[in-house]
């Protein structure tokens, strides 16, 4: 159970990071960050 929960947490965090990266890369002040 703990392993599945950890995996779900990582997946959720990854999704949030992806959304943040998209909004950041669309922002002229932020799009120069690594990963854009």
Swiss-Prot record:
Superkingdom assignment: Eukaryota
Gene Ontology molecular functions: acetylcholine receptor inhibitor activity; ion channel regulator activity; toxin activity
Tissue and organ expression note: Expressed by the venom duct.
UniProt-annotated location(s): Secreted
Prodomain positions: 1-21
InterPro entries registered for this protein in UniProt: Conotoxin_a-typ (IPR009958)
Matches recorded under Pfam families: Toxin_8
GO CC term (a single one): extracellular region
UniProt keyword terms in alphabetical order: Acetylcholine receptor inhibiting toxin, Disulfide bond, Ion channel impairing toxin, Neurotoxin, Postsynaptic neurotoxin, Secreted, Toxin
Disulfide bonds: 24-30, 25-36
Family, per entry: Belongs to the conotoxin A superfamily.
Function comment: Alpha-conotoxins act on postsynaptic membranes, they bind to the nicotinic acetylcholine receptors (nAChR) and thus inhibit them.
Record note on domains: The cysteine framework is I (CC-C-C). Alpha4/5 pattern.
Protein name: Alpha-conotoxin-like Pu1.3
Species annotation: Conus pulicarius (Flea-bitten cone)
């Amino acid at each position: 159970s703990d392993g599945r929960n950890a995996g779900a947490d990582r997946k959720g965090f990854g999704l949030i990071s992806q959304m943040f990266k998209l909004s950041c890369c669309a922002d002229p002040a932020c799009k120069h960050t690594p990963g854009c």
